[in-house]
């Protein structure tokens, strides 16, 4: 156990840089694939946000958004519609409720978390699935 802790501690900076690179890659790919997407809060600003989380508001109608999580789940993509502290709640995120406009609250927001176990090919898959979903009839 002690060796695992030491190894983990010694890898913190390397893992942080790897994860930050993934987050930046995701930002670059998603903004070019889904131009009307909005970042919730300042999550895309690496100077003022955590390096492992992004929360986005997608340009999808309320009716179509009902199928979004189901579609992502079928494709093997794990993400969340709410904040971690609201897990299991139907009231929505109090943070998103306070920072989003009424029209943006009607659109789906998704939270993506990145770790040292993710890779760019997984991000490419997420971007393709989201882009295909948004552009489908």
Placement of each model-derived feature along the sequence:
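Pyridoxal 5′-phosphate
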Residues: 2-137
């Amino acid at each position: 156990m002690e060796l695992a802790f030491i190894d983990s501690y010694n890898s913190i900076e390397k893992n942080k840089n790897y994860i930050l690179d993934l987050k930046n890659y995701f930002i670059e790919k998603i903004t070019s694939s889904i131009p009307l997407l909005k970042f919730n809060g300042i999550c895309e600003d690496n100077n003022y946000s955590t390096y492992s989380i992004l929360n986005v508001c997608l340009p999808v109608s309320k009716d179509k958004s009902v199928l979004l999580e189901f579609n992502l789940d079928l494709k093997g993509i794990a993400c969340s519609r709410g904040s971690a502290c609201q897990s299991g709640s139907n009231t929505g995120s109090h943070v998103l409720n306070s920072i989003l406009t009424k029209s943006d609250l009607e659109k789906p927001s998704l939270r993506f978390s990145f770790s040292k176990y993710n890779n760019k090919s997984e991000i490419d898959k997420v971007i393709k699935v989201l882009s295909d979903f948004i552009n489908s009839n």
